[in-house]
Amino acid sequence: MAMAGADGPTAGAAAAVRWRGGESLLLLLLRWPSSAELVAAWGAARASAVAPALAAASAACLALSAMLLADAVLMAAACFARRRPDRRYRATPLGAGAGADDDDDDEEAGRVAYPMVLVQIPMYNEREVYKLSIGAACGLSWPSDRLIVQVLDDSTDPTVKGLVELECKSWGNKGKNVKYEVRNTRKGYKAGALKEGLLRDYVQQCNYVAIFDADFQPEPDFLLRTIPYLVRNPQIGLVQAHWEFVNTSECLMTRIQKMTLHYHFKVEQEGGSSTFAFFGFNGTAGVWRISALEEAGGWKDRTTVEDMDLAVRAGLKGWKFVYLADVKVKSELPSNLKTYRHQQHRWTCGAANLFRKVGAEILFTKEVPFWWKFYLLYSFFFVRKVVAHVVPFMLYCVVIPFSVLIPEVTVPVWGVVYVPTTITLLHAIRNTSSIHFIPFWILFENVMSFHRTKAMFIGLLELGGVNEWVVTEKLGNGSNTKPASQILERPPCRFWDRWTMSEILFSIFLFFCATYNLAYGGDYYFVYIYLQAIAFLVVGIGFCGTISSNS
């Protein structure tokens, strides 16, 4: 009876569990491994798969870092030993009869001295800046009968189109030769507008074309300082000026951008100009010889970096480029984080996609020597357009944080400290006025490398969004005292609309790695990882740059 009484409640409880559908749960709990078994399983997986994979990634990143360092050293050396353009090329000022053989006809000599120049200004709904660029172009010191200002308006806002057309007519009434051109479609975006603009009949009389984006304001003597290089040196196809920024002090993000772009111009552009007479056209603040542009095949819209595409094709035809560091053109930096992201995606994705499209053409062309092809494929494209984006993210945001969790893998000190320090110093040498922003620049650039790496793979593999084109938002002259919200006249956005979960989640991962290293590690990686985690979090919650309704 006692035995039966004991069995009865037990059987009833088991039946109740089965009745509630809990039998499988009980079996799962009974079979669930203990903590010791889990630790042992993780140790085996870590030793057999995770650690070897991380070690391979570390070795690859270190090799790529060495490539970056070598390229940075060579470019820095080229800049310090630079050959000034005015010492390598003839660039005496233009004057009556200058640039032509002896000619008794003063009028004809003057026409040769001041060739016909076309100024193209592509724009798209540029409400805040259209007056700046049109006014600056019309104010260029050049004979009015030798200059045509062509405004290529792709605006979809009828109000903006009306304002731009009215501004063109206003300058036309002042005696300036201003042509207002519109299209029925936006096919090809900027490249399509520039290409169609060159098809106009009046362009046939022009020898050179200067291009300015809508927020660029050339100084009156811009043509007087650039055109002589083209007139005196028939082998030169492009003259590129330096960008100067009117809103550098607007926020920390614009200061960091200025450092990055200053290095790009002072090292990459200047180094390419003085060593190989080649660099990527920046799309604005430059003057092309129209015959060089046409020989290269004209504008193509196959990528979002139509300017670089044109430069590569012109370089393959043997045309030389000149960068003039002392000719500066005022422009505006994007001060809004979302706008800056779109710009960086377009530049990074487009460059990688162009590498994919022209790599074979560069390799098999017979029109340029081997060393020039090697420079273009290895240094210009692979190192600067691929490696430069992958290494900051993979090494400093993935491999190093993961290595604190995997004791079997140790990243050597030279790869963690010496190489990045040397590269940073090479950047700082050309940015002495902003050297105190170097720590912020490093952390912010590592965060942006997350987006650039993704954009690079999209372009290299031609994935979705490869031809995504978003016009960079411009707010007008940096001296404008009105806040951005008043300029844009748009309702403010909610703060959580600016959040990006990818950065926030990545910051959580970095915080975990840093805390683990602080608790169990024998080194001080947690100091850097904590700082990088904070940088990801700050960017992730949108607390970076100025705020507008598009943020």
From Swiss-Prot:
It is an enzyme of class 2 (transferase). One of its GO terms (cellular component) is Golgi membrane. The active site is at D154, D307. It catalyses: GDP-mannose + (glucomannan)n = GDP + (glucomannan)n+1. Pfam families: Glyco_trans_2_3 (PF13632). GO terms for biological process: cell wall organization. It is a multi-pass membrane protein. InterPro entries: Glyco_trans_2-like (IPR001173), Nucleotide-diphossugar_trans (IPR029044). Its main location: Golgi. PANTHER family: GLUCOMANNAN 4-BETA-MANNOSYLTRANSFERASE 3-RELATED (PTHR32044:SF98), GLUCOMANNAN 4-BETA-MANNOSYLTRANSFERASE 9 (PTHR32044). Probable mannan synthase which consists of a 4-beta-mannosyltransferase activity on mannan using GDP-mannose. The beta-1,4-mannan product is the backbone for galactomannan synthesis by galactomannan galactosyltransferase. Galactomannan is a noncellulosic polysaccharides of plant cell wall. This is Probable glucomannan 4-beta-mannosyltransferase 3. It comes from Oryza sativa subsp. japonica (Rice).
